[in-house]
């Protein structure tokens, strides 16, 4: 090329000093250890950074003398100096063109722009680094302050422990020993050694690299023998690795960040250990040694050790213990280890696992022994507060009495109530007998007060109904017919009233009949400890006639007087409580329960619980069939809204919300299942029960499905059928429920070949069609005694008939004849009675029965005859038996089959 500025010939020349490459690699060997005791020599090379320049080679590692300012913007390295040109000779270069000049100008402008941008980025990076370093410095100072406080606390603890040991030795006569002998003296704090990044380097020991301001202090410590030459020197007094702060380097050639010198005592380690060459130190030779993970782990363990030596405060907890709890759950509630609980049980002689269930008493002993307080709870706690809450006497008011009418069958209980209510309930009852329990309200014409009457059945099958009526009543009116006297159900009603501890008013009915004898009734009542007032007792008696409505007002007056004596009061503003008198499943209205409210007021919308059923009151219907919004104390109502029909006799209560209702019903359902399972498992317990099961294993069963209109009638039917069972045959109730006969009942009956019985209910159209299609028998009844009689007859048909033997006569064998085509024929003489052809016979030899069978041939003078009278001779042959001898006796008898009945 031609240079326009220096025209002339130019020649290329070589610089005076020849360029050369010096080896920049330092080598060394280390021994690398492997598992199982193996080791290997490894050659390690340290490659230094190549630096080009005329300055002398540095002999010490570079150390920054002070914190480096912001790094200048990087620029392109300067070209090497041009060699001296020899004027007057060489190749002539051509002049630059305009395109080349413009290209060079644009490249120069771009370079300047890049330089400005790089300088700006460097300044921003320096600012960010300064902010980060300030935050790290503040964090480091805070950590240093915490470490100083921790060291001071440890020093005080060690001093206190040392004093305690000295005092203990003095007390036990071992003599006082100086603290220096008991504990090694702590090395005096040494002056901090110069560290990389210190503000000033040791004078006279630095070597300055050209173009830099970084100094490398020369070390005064000899290198380890065998170390490679040129390796960075080791620090003379390096702090302990547990206490050495971490040094952060920003990169090769960058200045190290200054760190404050440590002010704590340093433990000088062996020079040999610090100068050892390893793979890590060889690869990171230009970095300062950092704190290792093992050092951090040792420090953490040391702090944990100090913390474990401190006495821990025992936490006392309130432990809730149910009726049964596992060991693991008990330990969790006490915040104790399960092994500690098992260890305590082992001391008591019980071996358990953490999954074993222990009772509440054992759990309470363990919790109290560990210092905790115990709160015992039970599953039945969900029923607390439902019933029998004490009312304040200032909030009570007088309520109507509840009167139960009881007595024997056909003594006129329902007729008496009809006369009081001016109604005709008897005509509506099937067969003219009461089979349901009913509740009614009557207004007394004298005082205008209401009286609640409960009518109970008088038949023997309705014992449970009478017992329920006696439990919820205040007064019992015992109806006795004047012409019939005291009967078995009358005695039962007296016992129910005594068990319920309620007063009795005797109503002697049917005094209008000519053969009525009221005095005989009073005398018979004395035999059962019922003493009327006319006989000097305290029991009120009234002679009435339901037919002619005689003395009914006097009976009401006596009831009101007895109620005043009882002083019946209750709080009507509290949540309602009552008793389910009767329950049924209505097809249109769903589950319906007849409830007698005893305390409080039952309102529409209340959430109620009765037995294992719950619900919300949708409607209240009075005894007159009217819909009401609320029912107060002593008021009988029909309640609609249950999820299912409750059982008769269940107590009803109003709860605050559905969650509480679900808790109560789930607990009661669980108890019901447990009781059923216990009754089944209890039947397999003892040896006697097993023998009885073996005895009844051959018992025949009569499968039945029973559907009734109300719960009380169903209960009476089941009780009556249960009494029909014997050791040979029994009624097996596959399903019993309240409501109409459904298609599912027919399906169940088909699977077990059972009969379906409907009491005051009918089958729907689908069920009737399915029963007709599958040949299932459905029987309908309205009177309980007709139902029981038919089932009794059907069960009697399953009984094995009785076989009765009737003796006909005896015959003695005189001689044996062999007849062709017939075999042996015995020539006999009838000694007693008669002998008939086809009758059963026994062959007796020496008073021992040797054969039982039937006569095949009976002849007299070669003629077949039907019978032979006593004193006559005949010939007899047996079926399939010919071993007859002279002198044997033939006994002839007839077997009669007699059908048995329950």
From Swiss-Prot:
Residues 545-547 are annotated as: G5. Residues 509-512 are annotated as: G4. Keywords: Cytoplasm, GTP-binding, Initiation factor, Nucleotide-binding, Protein biosynthesis. GTP binds at residues 407-414, 455-459, 509-512. Residues 1-276 are annotated as: Disordered. Residues 455-458 are annotated as: G3. One of its GO terms (biological process) is translational initiation. One of its GO terms (cellular component) is cytosol. The keyword GTP-binding applies. GO terms for molecular function: GTP binding; GTPase activity; guanosine tetraphosphate binding; translation initiation factor activity. Belongs to the TRAFAC class translation factor GTPase superfamily. Classic translation factor GTPase family. IF-2 subfamily. This is Translation initiation factor IF-2. It comes from Bradyrhizobium diazoefficiens (strain JCM 10833 / BCRC 13528 / IAM 13628 / NBRC 14792 / USDA 110). The gene is infB.
């Amino acid at each position: 090329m031609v240079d326009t500025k220096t025209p002339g010939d130019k020649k290329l020349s070589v610089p005076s000093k020849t360029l050369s490459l010096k080896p920049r690699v330092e080598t060394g060997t280390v021994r690398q250890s492997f598992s199982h005791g193996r080791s290997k020599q490894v050659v390690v090379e340290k490659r230094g950074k190549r630096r080009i320049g005329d300055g002398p080679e540095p002999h010490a590692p570079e150390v920054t003398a002070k914190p480096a300012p912001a790094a200048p913007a990087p620029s392109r390295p300067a070209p090497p100096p041009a060699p001296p040109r020899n004027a007057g000779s060489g190749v002539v270069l051509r002049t630059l063109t305009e395109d080349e000049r413009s290209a060079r100008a644009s490249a120069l402008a771009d370079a300047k722009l890049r330089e400005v941008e790089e300088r700006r980025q460097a300044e921003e990076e320096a600012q960010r680094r300064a902010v980060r370093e300030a935050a790290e410095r503040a964090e480091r100072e805070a950590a240093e302050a915490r470490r100083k406080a921790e060291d001071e606390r440890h020093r005080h603890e060690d001093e206190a422990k040392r004093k305690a040991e000295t005092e203990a030795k003095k007390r036990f006569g071992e003599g006082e020993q100086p603290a220096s002998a008991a504990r090694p003296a702590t090395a005096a704090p040494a002056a901090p050694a110069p560290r990389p990044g210190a503000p000033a380097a040791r004078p006279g020991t630095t070597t300055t690299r050209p173009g830099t301001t970084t100094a490398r202090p020369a070390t005064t410590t000899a290198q380890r023998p065998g170390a490679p030459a040129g390796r960075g020197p080791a620090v003379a007094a390096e702090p302990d690795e547990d206490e050495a702060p971490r040094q952060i380097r920003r990169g090769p050639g960058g200045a190290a960040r200054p760190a404050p010198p440590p002010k704590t005592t340093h433990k000088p380690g062996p020079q040999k250990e610090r100068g050892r060459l390893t793979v890590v130190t060889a690869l990171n030779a230009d970095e300062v040694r950092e704190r290792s993970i093992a050092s951090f782990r040792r420090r953490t363990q040391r702090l944990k050790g100090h913390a474990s030596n401190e006495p821990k405060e025992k936490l006392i907890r309130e432990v809730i213990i149910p009726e049964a709890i596992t060991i693991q759950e008990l330990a969790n509630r006490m915040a104790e280890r399960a092994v500690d609980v098992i260890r305590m049980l082992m001391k008591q002689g019980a071996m358990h696992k953490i999954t074993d269930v222990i009772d509440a008493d054992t759990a309470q002993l363990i919790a109290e022994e560990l210092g905790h307080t115990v709160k015992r709870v039970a599953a039945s706690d969900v029923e607390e507060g439902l019933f029998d809450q004490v009312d304040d006497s200032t909030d009570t008011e007088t309520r109507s009495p509840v009167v139960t009418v009881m007595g024997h069958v056909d003594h006129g209980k329902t007729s008496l109530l009809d006369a009081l209510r001016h109604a005709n309930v008897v005509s509506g009852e099937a067969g003219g007998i009461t089979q349901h329990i009913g509740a009614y309200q009557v207004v007394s014409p004298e005082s205008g007060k209401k009286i609640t009457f409960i009518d109970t059945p008088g038949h023997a099958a309705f014992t449970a109904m009478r017992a329920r009526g006696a439990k919820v009543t205040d007064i019992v009116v015992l109806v006795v017919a004047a012409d019939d006297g005291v009967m078995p159900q009358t005695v039962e009603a007296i016992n129910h009233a005594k068990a319920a501890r309620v007063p009795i008013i005797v109503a002697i009915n049917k005094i209008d009949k000519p053969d009525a004898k009221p005095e005989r009734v009073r005398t018979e009542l004395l035999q059962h400890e019922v003493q009327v007032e006319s006989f000097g007792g305290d029991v009120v008696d009234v002679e009435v006639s339901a037919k002619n409505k005689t003395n009914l007002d006097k009976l009401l007056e006596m009831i009101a007087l007895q109620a005043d004596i009882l002083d019946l009061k209750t709080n009507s503003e509290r949540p309602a409580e009552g008793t389910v008198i009767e329950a049924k499943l209505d097809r249109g209205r769903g589950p319906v329960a007849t409830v007698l409210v005893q305390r409080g007021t039952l309102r529409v919308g209340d959430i109620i619980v009765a037995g294992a059923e719950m619900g919300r009151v949708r409607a209240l219907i009075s005894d007159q069939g009217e819909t009401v919004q609320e029912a107060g104390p002593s008021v009988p109502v029909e309640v609609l809204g249950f999820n299912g029909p409750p059982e008769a006799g269940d107590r009803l209560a109003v709860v605050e919300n559905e969650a509480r209702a679900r808790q109560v019903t789930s607990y009661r359902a669980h108890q019901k299942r447990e009781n059923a399972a216990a009754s089944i498992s209890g039947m397999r317990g003892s040896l006697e029960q097993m023998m009885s099961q073996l005895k009844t294993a051959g018992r025949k069963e009569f499968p039945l499905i029973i559907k009734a209109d109300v719960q009380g009638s169903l209960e009476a039917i089941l009780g009556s059928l249960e009494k029909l069972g014997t050791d040979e045959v029994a009624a097996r109730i596959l399903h019993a429920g309240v409501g109409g006969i459904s298609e599912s009942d027919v399906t169940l009956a088909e699977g077990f070949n059972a009969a379906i019985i409907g009491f005051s209910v009918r089958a729907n159209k689908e069920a009737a069609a399915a029963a007709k299609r599958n040949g299932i028998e459905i029987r309908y009844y309205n009177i309980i005694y007709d139902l029981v009689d038919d089932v009794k007859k059907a069960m009697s048909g399953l009984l094995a008939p009785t076989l009765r033997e009737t003796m006909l006569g005896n015959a003695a064998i005189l001689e044996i004849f062999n007849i062709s085509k017939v075999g042996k024929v015995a020539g006999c003489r009838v000694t007693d009675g008669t002998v008939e052809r086809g009758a059963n016979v026994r062959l007796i030899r020496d008073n021992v029965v040797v054969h039982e069978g039937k006569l095949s041939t009976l002849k007299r003078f070669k003629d077949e005859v039907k019978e032979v009278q006593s004193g006559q001779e005949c010939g007899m042959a047996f079926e399939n038996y010919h071993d007859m001898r002279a002198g044997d006796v033939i006994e002839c008898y007839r077997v009669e089959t007699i059908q048995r009945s329950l």
